[in-house]
């Protein structure tokens, strides 16, 4: 059985931001619990990058707009024969609840910005080797606290992002499920099509091909060029089958 590799590519700035936030939040929990310097730096570096992303745009505003848009889309299915009405109603209520929590939450990331330890580490992350014990004795002593004490603090930091995480997860799940995968074929390593106002491209490609896609474009039109992983000896077949969803 062939192994399929999923590639996702945003077709607008809001989706690019959402995917980056999703990626960084996922990275926060990869190396938990924090037991050493390496795990701590991985965690704090991702926190710092998250805060940088938050400061660049209106994340809350865009998410609230999308939660409302998804509710309107679901409402068009109310009363349609053959559609699970209880499921539609449940999703609409979940979207409303996520929006209410998000709109009443403090400024996104504010709890993390105001934390003294996070602020100290952020100041040193851009300096090569800047998080040594003599540079950051605060972090050094924190790593020697009882594990349960560190775990509790980390859980509190992550929980402060719950209003955002809940809303973002719902939005991205609905967008990803909005379009099915369809078989497509590239010619000489190239494929292009109309986006149809899509926000996100999802592409399944066989690992056996040892190829990856370079995607460019926007919601109205996009192009995909397939490139060999081995840039010197790899080859791109004249015809290449893959699966594509325009969400």
Curated annotation (Swiss-Prot):
Report the NCBIfam families cross-referenced here.
PRK05287.1-1, PRK05287.1-3
Q: Which branch of life, at top level? A: Bacteria
The subunit field of the Swiss-Prot or TrEMBL record says: Interacts with FtsZ.
Native species: Escherichia coli O1:K1 / APEC
Which parts pass through the membrane? Answer: none
User: What's this protein's name?
Assistant: Cell division protein ZapD
Pfam families named in the record = ZapD (PF07072)
Q: Which GO terms describe its cellular component?
A: cell division site; cytoplasm
Q: Which UniProt keywords apply?
A: Cell cycle, Cell division, Cytoplasm, Septation
Q: Which GO terms describe its biological process?
A: division septum assembly; FtsZ-dependent cytokinesis
Compartment(s) of residence: Cytoplasm
Q: Which family does it belong to?
A: Belongs to the ZapD family.
Keyword Cell cycle in the entry? The reply is yes
The main location is cytoplasm
Q: What does this protein do?
A: Cell division factor that enhances FtsZ-ring assembly. Directly interacts with FtsZ and promotes bundling of FtsZ protofilaments, with a reduction in FtsZ GTPase activity.
């Amino acid at each position: 059985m062939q192994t399929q590799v999923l590639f996702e590519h945003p077709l607008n700035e809001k989706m690019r931001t959402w995917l980056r936030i999703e990626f960084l939040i996922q990275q926060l929990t990869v190396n938990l619990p924090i037991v050493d310097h390496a795990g701590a730096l991985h965690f704090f570096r991702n926190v710092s990058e998250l805060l940088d992303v938050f400061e660049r745009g209106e994340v809350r505003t865009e998410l609230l707009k999308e939660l409302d848009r998804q509710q309107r889309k679901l409402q068009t299915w109310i009363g349609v024969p053959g559609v699970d009405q209880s499921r539609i109603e449940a999703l609409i209520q979940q979207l409303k609840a996520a929006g209410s929590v998000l709109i009443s939450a403090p400024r996104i990331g504010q709890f993390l910005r105001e934390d003294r330890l996070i602020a100290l580490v952020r100041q040193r992350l851009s300096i090569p080797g800047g998080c040594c014990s003599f540079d950051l004795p605060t972090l050094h002593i924190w790593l020697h606290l009882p594990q349960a004490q560190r775990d509790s603090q980390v859980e509190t930091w992550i929980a402060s992002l719950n209003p955002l995480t809940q809303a973002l997860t719902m939005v991205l799940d609905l967008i990803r499920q909005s379009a099915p995968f369809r078989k497509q074929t590239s010619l000489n390593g190239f494929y292009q099509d109309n986006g149809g106002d899509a926000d996100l491209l999802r592409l399944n490609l066989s690992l056996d091909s040892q190829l990856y896609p370079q995607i460019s474009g926007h919601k109205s039109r996009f192009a995909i060029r397939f490139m060999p992983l081995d840039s010197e000896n790899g080859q791109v077949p004249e015809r290449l089958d893959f699966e594509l969803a325009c969400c």
